[in-house]
């Protein structure tokens, strides 16, 4: 039986494709069982290289089966088909953080603090459970229709991590969100990589632009070492700027832990920027 026919028999009606990767695509669908809209990630293991099938995909599935957090995407079920396809049925989202930034120009201070607090809390949960994401970026942060609640998604580069000296060597994620040590090919602490990526996400949220020009990847670490600049005329609190500076420390050991980020004073502050 084909995968699409099986899904139909299980009460799913597939809709349009809303995302596509090298070996997978994400489709929106309606579900009789879950009485509403869901997202279904379709993974074609026949087209994927052995490294993906034997290493990265099992890690992703293990994480998705084990995590339970209000700000991490929830998976309803996994459907395996004999033709090599795997269907991952999960929560659907109205939009993502990148689309919200592009639509609004930037995220206002109080809303940015609310959303970033949720993101930081989810990353803290992962790290407390010895898990890392390694591909945190605005398009992997899903948003509710009112743009007040987040869900972190896409654990394709996720893995277990127990901290130093349990270092990673795989280049993961997008260059624009990658930390200096990852770009330089140095064995890295993946938790500190996640923290760097949090800094990039926060900068994008509050400014509407990337902190570093990534058109020349070879020169990117040099620009990262110089630190960030802010657009002229941008109103942003010093507490927020200070948090961004902490997250984007060139030296991994100088960056805070995810737990320290979640407790940062700006996230509890009453100022608007």
Swiss-Prot record:
Pfam families hit by this protein: Pkinase
Compartments reported by the entry: Cytoplasm, Cytoskeleton, Flagellum axoneme; Nucleus
Name of the protein described by the UniProt record: Testis-specific serine/threonine-protein kinase 6
Purpose of the protein: Serine/threonine-protein kinase component of the sperm flagellar doublet microtubules. May act as a regulator of sperm motility by mediating phosphorylation of sperm doublet microtubule proteins. Plays a role in DNA condensation during postmeiotic chromatin remodeling and histone-to-protamine transition during spermatogenesis.
Homology family: Belongs to the protein kinase superfamily. CAMK Ser/Thr protein kinase family.
Record's cofactor remark: Mg(2+) and Mn(2+) were both present in the kinase buffer but Mg(2+) is likely to be the in vivo cofactor.
Entry-linked InterPro entries: Kinase-like_dom_sf, Prot_kinase_dom, Protein_kinase_ATP_BS, Ser/Thr_kinase_AS, TSSK6_STKc
Binding site for ATP: 18-26, 41
Record PTM text: Autophosphorylated. Ubiquitinated; HSP90 activity negatively regulates ubiquitination and degradation.
Active site: 135 (proton acceptor)
């Amino acid at each position: 039986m084909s995968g699409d026919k099986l899904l139909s028999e299980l009460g799913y009606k597939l809709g349009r494709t809303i995302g596509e990767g090298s070996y997978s695509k994400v489709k929106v669908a309606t579900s009789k069982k879950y009485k509403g809209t869901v997202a279904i990630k379709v993974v074609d293991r026949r087209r994927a290289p052995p490294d993906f099938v034997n290493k990265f995909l099992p890690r992703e599935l293990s994480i998705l089966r084990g995590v339970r957090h209000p700000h991490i995407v929830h998976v309803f079920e996994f459907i395996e088909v004999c033709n090599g396809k795997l269907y991952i049925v999960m929560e659907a989202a109205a939009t993502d953080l990148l689309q919200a930034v592009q639509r609004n120009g930037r995220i206002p201070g109080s809303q940015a603090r609310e959303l970033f607090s949720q993101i930081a809390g989810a990353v803290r949960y992962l790290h407390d459970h010895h898990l890392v994401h390694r591909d945190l970026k605005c398009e992997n942060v899903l948003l509710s229709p009112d743009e007040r609640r987040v869900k972190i998604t896409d654990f394709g580069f996720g893995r277990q991590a127990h901290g130093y000296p349990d270092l990673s060597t795989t280049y993961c994620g997008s260059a624009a969100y990658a930390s200096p040590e990852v770009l330089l090919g140095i064995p890295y602490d993946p938790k500190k990589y996640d923290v760097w990526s949090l800094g990039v996400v926060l900068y994008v949220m509050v400014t509407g632009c990337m902190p570093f020009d990534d058109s020349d990847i070879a020169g990117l670490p040099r620009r990262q070492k110089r630190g960030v600049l802010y657009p002229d005329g941008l109103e942003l609190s010093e507490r927020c700027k200070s948090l961004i500076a902490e997250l984007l420390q060139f030296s991994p050991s100088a960056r805070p832990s995810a737990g320290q980020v979640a407790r940062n004073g700006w996230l509890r502050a009453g100022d608007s920027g």
